[in-house]
C-alpha cells in the first residue's frame, strides 16, 4: 500500500476508533472524535544508551525474585502534572515543616508503615499500609531521570521515552516492538485517558482512548445503531485504489471491534456509561479489560490535575483519594477475578514539586518525587535528601529506569536493550 502505510494513515487521520484505528474519514459519526481515541504511530528512531543510578535501600526489603507469571500485565498509573512527593510520602523531618509552614502535614495525621521510622504516608493513602503489611508494596523515594528538567513537555518526554535526548519511541513501545508476534494485536498496549507517547513504537500498534465513557458511535436521534454499523462495514469493501481511502476502509472492522471491546469492559466495571473519567473510573475499565483475556500486556492510566501551583492541600487530598480508591477497587476486582498474581501496578509522575511552598498555598515544579509499585515484595528505595538540595529541589536518589527495568523483567523481554543500559532492579 505505497509509502502511506495503513498504520501511518491511521495516525494522521486522528480518528476515534483505535483498535488499529483512526478512521478520521468517518469521524462525523463519532462523538468528539479527536478526544476519544487515537492510534499511537510508529516512529523512525530507536535510542541508544543512558547512565545508571544505583539503588539506595533505606528499609528492609523482601529479596527473593518472583517467578515470572504467565501472561503478565503491567498497569502504569500516571499522575499528570507533577505530583508533590513530599506531601505524598512525608518525611518526619523539621526541615520539611520549616519549608512548608502552611502545607506541611502534621506528623500525627500520617499513616505509618511497619518498620519505617523516617516517613509516613498522606492520610488519603491509608490502604497502602495494608499492601505494605502483605509484602506487596515497593516505594521509590527521590525517583526521577537525571536532566529531565522542570518543563512538563520535556520531563514527560523523558519519562515516556526513558531518555533525555530526542528519542521518538516510548519505552513500552520499544518493548511492544521487541515482543510483537506474527499477528499484530493492537490491544497488547492500551492507554486510557492519555499517555500515547509511552506506547509509541517503530512497528507495533497500540490503542489510546482519551475518554472510555465517550468512546462509542454517536448515532443521531431515531437512528438504529445496527444500521450505522452495517453502513460502516459495507464501505469497507471493495478497497479503493487510492491508498489513503483504502487504509481507512481496512481499519473499519477493527475500529468497530475496538468500540465493542472498550464499552464491554466499561459496562462490566461500571454500569454508568457517562461516569466522570478519574483514576477510579479508568482503573475499573482496566480491570474489565484484563478480565476479558485480550492478551493485553500493558495498560496506561493517565489523570491530570497534579500541577498544584495554588490551593494545593484540598486538591491534592482529592486527587490522592481518587487514586487510592481506584487502586483499591482495581486490586479487589482483579483478586476476585483471579488475575492479581500476574499484575504489577506502577505509579509515575513527570516530576515532583519544589521543597519550599510558594506564596499561593501551592508548590512549583521541582525534580525528584515518589513512585509506588504494587505486586510481589516490599521495600523502600532511595531517599528524600532534604539536606543536599539542588537549586531548591530534592535530588534524584534513584533513577526511575530501575523501576522500568523491574517492570520490563516482569513482562519478559530484552530489558537492557530496550532501556539502552543496565539498571538495578527492585527485585
Which residue stretches match the model-derived regions?
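Feature for exported/extracytoplasmic and membrane-associated proteins, marking the mature portion
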Residues: 2-337, 356, 370-374, 378-427
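Conserved H-loop
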Residues: 340
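Acidic/histidine-rich, metal-coordinating catalytic segments
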Residues: 343-351
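Conserved active-site-proximal phosphate/metal-binding subdomains
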Residues: 365-366
Amino acid at each position: 500500500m505505497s509509502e502511506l502505510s495503513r498504520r501511518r494513515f491511521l495516525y494522521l487521520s486522528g480518528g476515534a476508533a483505535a483498535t488499529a484505528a483512526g478512521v478520521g474519514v468517518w469521524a462525523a459519526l463519532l462523538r468528539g472524535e479527536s478526544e476519544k481515541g487515537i492510534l499511537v504511530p510508529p516512529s523512525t528512531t530507536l535510542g541508544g544508551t543512558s547512565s545508571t543510578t544505583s539503588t539506595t535501600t533505606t528499609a528492609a526489603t523482601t529479596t527473593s525474585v518472583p517467578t515470572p507469571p504467565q501472561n503478565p500485565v503491567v498497569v502504569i498509573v500516571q499522575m499528570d502534572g507533577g505530583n508533590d512527593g513530599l506531601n505524598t510520602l512525608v518525611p518526619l523531618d523539621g526541615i520539611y515543616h520549616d519549608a512548608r509552614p502552611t502545607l506541611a502535614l502534621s506528623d500525627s495525621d500520617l499513616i505509618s508503615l511497619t518498620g519505617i521510622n523516617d516517613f509516613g504516608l498522606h492520610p488519603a493513602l491509608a490502604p497502602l499500609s495494608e499492601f505494605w503489611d502483605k509484602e506487596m508494596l515497593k516505594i521509590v523515594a527521590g525517583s526521577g531521570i537525571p536532566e529531565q528538567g522542570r518543563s512538563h513537555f520535556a520531563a514527560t518526554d523523558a519519562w515516556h521515552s526513558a531518555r533525555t535526548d530526542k528519542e521518538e519511541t516510548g519505552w513500552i513501545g520499544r518493548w511492544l516492538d521487541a515482543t510483537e508476534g506474527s499477528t499484530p494485536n493492537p490491544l497488547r498496549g492500551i492507554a486510557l485517558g492519555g499517555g500515547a507517547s509511552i506506547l509509541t513504537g517503530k512497528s507495533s500498534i497500540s490503542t489510546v482512548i482519551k475518554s472510555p465513557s465517550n468512546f462509542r458511535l454517536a448515532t443521531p436521534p431515531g437512528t438504529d445503531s445496527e444500521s450505522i454499523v452495517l453502513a460502516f462495514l459495507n464501505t469497507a469493501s471493495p478497497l479503493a485504489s487510492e491508498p489513503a481511502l483504502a487504509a481507512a476502509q481496512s481499519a473499519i472492522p477493527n475500529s468497530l471491534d475496538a468500540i465493542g471491546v472498550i464499552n464491554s469492559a466499561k459496562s462490566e466495571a461500571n454500569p454508568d456509561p457517562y461516569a466522570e473519567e478519574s483514576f477510579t473510573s479508568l482503573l475499573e475499565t482496566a480491570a474489565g479489560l484484563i478480565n476479558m483475556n485480550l492478551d493485553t500486556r500493558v495498560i496506561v492510566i493517565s489523570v491530570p490535575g497534579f500541577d498544584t501551583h495554588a490551593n494545593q492541600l484540598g486538591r491534592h487530598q482529592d486527587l490522592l483519594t481518587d487514586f487510592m480508591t481506584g487502586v483499591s477497587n482495581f486490586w479487589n476486582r482483579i483478586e476476585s477475578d483471579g488475575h492479581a498474581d500476574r499484575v504489577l501496578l506502577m505509579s509515575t509522575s513527570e516530576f515532583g514539586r519544589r521543597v519550599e511552598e510558594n506564596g499561593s498555598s501551592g508548590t512549583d515544579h521541582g525534580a525528584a518525587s515518589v513512585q509506588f509499585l504494587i505486586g510481589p515484595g516490599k521495600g523502600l528505595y532511595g531517599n528524600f535528601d532534604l539536606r543536599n538540595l539542588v537549586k531548591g529541589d530534592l535530588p534524584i536518589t534513584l533513577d526511575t529506569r530501575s523501576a522500568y527495568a523491574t517492570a520490563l523483567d516482569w513482562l519478559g523481554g530484552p530489558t537492557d536493550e530496550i532501556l539502552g543500559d543496565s539498571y538495578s532492579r527492585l527485585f
